[in-house]
A protein has these predicted regions:
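Conserved two-metal-ion catalytic palm core of "right-hand" nucleic acid polymerases
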Residues: 2-248
Length: 248
């Protein structure tokens, strides 16, 4: 049980807690949750999700009580209770994404511009058909984020280890990477305060690698065709029934 947060030394926790195998919730220790909490909080910071930040602020008002309650529920492996802790009635938010205006053909033929953005907006509200787009974003509880980080610390890092160097997105922080790729010595970095590598670093590497490949192909007098795809609402259109498929 956690007695007093202000006396926790996270550096000592990391040296005492190496990456270990998951043997069941009954073997869970409070230090496992503290490390997972630290990573979850840092990961949320980089996402810049205001709603999630507010949840963490409220969680820390009674931190010791909240973390101990979660610890006890996990130790009992009470699945129904765990799910109720992780998902509440505010588990998603509709964030405004864009406003599109479809104006009539006659108006599109007029070559004029209004210098005031506010007046131009008022005119479009009056004369054009409006389509408002939003994006569904997860707004999970702090307990859900802790459980996610806990899963990564115990199990998820093993899946990440099997990915090739050609997988750039959302890779975990590791030690002793060789040319950005996992080796037998590149263990999951439990001591790092975040779970994932900063997005912009692998993105830049992915971009540069692609451009270099194109340049080399052109230098070799080869024909090159480059496709850059952004699938619209991909995750929102996945059929969750695939989970029930034995092949999956």
């Amino acid at each position: 049980m956690l007695k007093c947060l202000k006396y926790i030394n996270f550096n000592e926790l990391f040296w005492a807690k190496m990456v270990k195998k998951f043997k069941g919730f009954e073997d869970l220790e409070i230090t496992d949750l503290l490390i997972a909490y630290r990573k979850a909080k840092a990961d949320i910071f980089w996402e810049k999700n205001i709603s999630a930040v507010e949840r963490f602020i409220n969680f820390e008002i009674n931190f010791e009580s909240n973390i101990n309650d979660l610890f006890e529920v996990l130790k009992k492996a009470d699945v129904e209770k765990i799910v109720s802790y992780c998902i509440d009635n505010e588990f998603y938010i509709n964030y405004p994404k864009s406003i599109d205006f479809e104006c009539n053909d006659e108006e599109s033929k007029d070559f004029y511009s209004i210098s005031s953005p506010a007046k131009e907006f008022e005119r479009k509200l009056k004369d054009c058909e409006i389509t408002i787009s939003s994006r569904i974003v997860g707004n999970f509880t702090v307990q859900a984020h802790i459980l996610s980080a806990l899963w990564i610390n115990f199990i998820g890092h093993k899946y990440d280890e099997k990915l090739s160097k050609n997988s750039y997105g959302s890779r975990l922080n590791r030690l002793n990477l060789e040319n950005g790729c996992c080796t037998n010595e590149s263990k999951y970095n439990l001591e790092k305060n975040t779970s994932f590598q900063p997005y912009f670093i692998p993105y830049k590497e992915w971009q540069s690698t692609g451009l270099n490949a194109v340049e080399k192909a052109l230098e070799a007098k080869k024909n090159v065709m480059v496709f850059s795809l952004d699938l619209k609402s991909y995750y929102h259109n996945i059929d969750v029934e695939i989970i029930n498929n034995d092949d999956f």
